[in-house]
Amino acid sequence: MFNWVKTAMLMAAITALFIVIGGMIGGSRGMTIALLIALGMNFFSYWFSDKMVLRMYNAQEVDETTAPQFYRMVRELATRANLPMPRVYLIDESQPNAFATGRNPEHAAVAATTGILRVLSEREMRGVMAHELAHVKHRDILISTISATMAGAISALANFAMFFGGRDENGRPANPIAGIAVALLAPIAGALIQMAISRAREFEADRGGAQISGDPQALASALDKIHRYASGIPFQTAEEHPATAQMMIMNPLSGGGLQNLFSTHPATEERIARLMEMARTGRFD
């Protein structure tokens, strides 16, 4: 419950930040326009983001005839989770990774790279897909889509404010130094809020996935293996579209420095430690 309250507060914060920047650009009218833009972007993301992401990664839908073992695994786990059967996709990429997408459990899809199927055992793969189905069950896809959309919009609005200036409530030019400061700091604040949302949801999906599979140790082993393999194998599509990195079970980006500082994923070691504690105690709370 605490994680859901925290997520709601963070979502409110990122929306408020977007509206404040709109106000700096155009006063009260700018705030109204920013709110309308935010609603429009989120509406579009809600209905079409899954199709865009799957097309972006050239994901190919599979079924019981084209990928029987993988498909049956997802179906069994979906039944255990009391979820509708999602669409199942494969991505021809060497890096081991996986993600879920779709606006709700009735319109969900799960995708895995061919690399992850080669690297993981069947038991570990069950742990990974249970994690992705937990994202579906928790409706994390909607949350992550909105937060990513808002973070990107904040960055775009901040750049607009820096280059074109802003207006105060009376329509007069705003303080240019304040505008530059907001333009520089707002995208960082947006990224930090998005990071906090994503990290909280990853921990919840690890816990939920362990409950679905009944085998937290399998997911812990899978995360360890994915972490070791993924760091040495580039994922070109993810590098070209870094905003989608938060969807993956493991950060697919190869960059270091600030990119790691603002990673949308918790430390793998901490995730594994939590899962191993679940395995030791048999408790998932």
Swiss-Prot record:
GO molecular function, one term: metalloendopeptidase activity
Residues that span the membrane, as ranges: 7-27, 30-50, 146-166, 177-197
Family: Belongs to the peptidase M48B family.
GO biological process: proteolysis
Species assigned in the record: Burkholderia thailandensis (strain ATCC 700388 / DSM 13276 / CCUG 48851 / CIP 106301 / E264)
InterPro entries associated with the record: HtpX_protease (IPR050083), Pept_M48_protease_HtpX (IPR022919), Peptidase_M48 (IPR001915)
Protein name: Protease HtpX homolog
Compartments in which it is found: Cell inner membrane
A Pfam match: Peptidase_M48
Residues the record marks as active site: E132
Keywords from the named record: Cell inner membrane, Cell membrane, Hydrolase, Membrane, Metal-binding, Metalloprotease, Protease, Transmembrane, Transmembrane helix, Zinc
